[in-house]
């Protein structure tokens, strides 16, 4: 079974906001989850102020007092900017920290079930892995992260694409996708890509229980996994692409597989990354 931390429908959702168009899109998706499932929404705004090294202790104390006076106004500003997109007055959290650290810390501190955040639409060299807060959060989060670029359609989750293999992350992603499909009556397409040299599967990708509980379709294609998944996503135009991911350790830190990383760069529509969780005994 999926680890209890991967709850769907999500009870509590964290929505980081930097007041950008992408953040507004994330707020609109959060509104859907609240109206559809009654999810609690917390909006997080992080700022990271680097003070000049020559500040004296007195100047630092004065600055902190001024910052405290400004906090109430800043909180109200974030609330007023968020309310039109959510349709209600959300819980607001202001944090002085780097955005990625603030998001990861808040998601754990408040026992969140999901993070919904915007992806800025940059491409090419401007969208290198470490250049995106969204990608850094996805890489390090232990929770499912829904990353979006634009506002949701009238029916936000009508078609789901879930690339699937026989690995544990793939199985967990499929189970999470099946939960969503069953809950919102969405069409679920399960895609398996056979790369050159792959051994044939010895068991069905989709179990009987999932087939009986969901509107599910299976597709098998040959080719490079990342490229084929990206092409299928562009052709099928799902409302959300759901992928499992397993972090691997290396000398330079943790990383995702090359397939997962490539899909994150190539994905056009909403992308929901489901991190691998160890199963409870």
Segments predicted by a language model, with ranges:
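Structural beta-alpha unit
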Residues: 1-9, 29, 42, 48-51, ...
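Small/aliphatic-rich secondary-structure junction motif
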Residues: 2-61, 158-220, 238-240, 266, ...
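Short glycine-rich, flexible loops that bind phosphorylated cofactors or substrates
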Residues: 22, 123-124, 249-251
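Short beta-strand elements of ligand-binding domains
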Residues: 117-119, 145-150, 271-275
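Charged helix-capping and loop-helix junction motifs
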Residues: 130-133, 255-260
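Short, structured interface segments
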Residues: 132-151
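Short, structured coil segments at secondary-structure junctions
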Residues: 133, 141, 212-214, 267-268
């Amino acid at each position: 079974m999926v680890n209890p931390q991967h709850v769907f429908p999500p009870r509590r959702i964290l929505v980081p906001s930097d007041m950008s168009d992408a953040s507004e899109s994330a707020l609109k998706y959060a509104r859907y989850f609240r109206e559809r499932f009654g999810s609690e929404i917390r909006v997080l705004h992080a700022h990271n102020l680097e003070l000049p090294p020559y500040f004296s202790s007195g100047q630092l104390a004065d600055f902190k007092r001024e910052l405290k006076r400004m906090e109430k106004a800043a909180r109200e500003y974030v609330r007023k900017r968020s309310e039109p997109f959510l349709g209600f007055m959300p819980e607001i959290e202001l944090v002085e920290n780097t955005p990625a650290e603030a998001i990861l810390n808040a998601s754990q501190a408040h026992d969140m079930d999901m993070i919904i955040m915007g992806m800025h639409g940059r491409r090419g060299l401007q969208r290198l892995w470490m250049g995106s807060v969204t990608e850094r959060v996805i890489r390090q989060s232990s929770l499912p992260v829904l990353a979006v670029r634009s506002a949701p359609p009238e029916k936000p989750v009508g078609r789901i694409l879930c690339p699937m293999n026989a690995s544990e992350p793939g199985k967990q992603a499929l189970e999470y996708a099946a939960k969503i499909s069953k809950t919102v009556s969405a069409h679920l397409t399960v895609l398996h890509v056979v790369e050159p040299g792959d051994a044939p599967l010895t068991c069905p990708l989709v179990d009987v229980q999932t087939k009986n509980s969901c509107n599910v379709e299976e597709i098998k294609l040959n080719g490079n996994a990342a490229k084929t998944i990206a092409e299928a996503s562009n052709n099928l135009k799902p409302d959300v692409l759901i992928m499992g991911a397993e972090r691997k350790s290396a000398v330079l830190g943790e990383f995702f597989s090359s397939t997962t990383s490539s899909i994150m760069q190539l994905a056009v529509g909403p992308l929901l990354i489901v991190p691998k969780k160890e199963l409870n005994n």
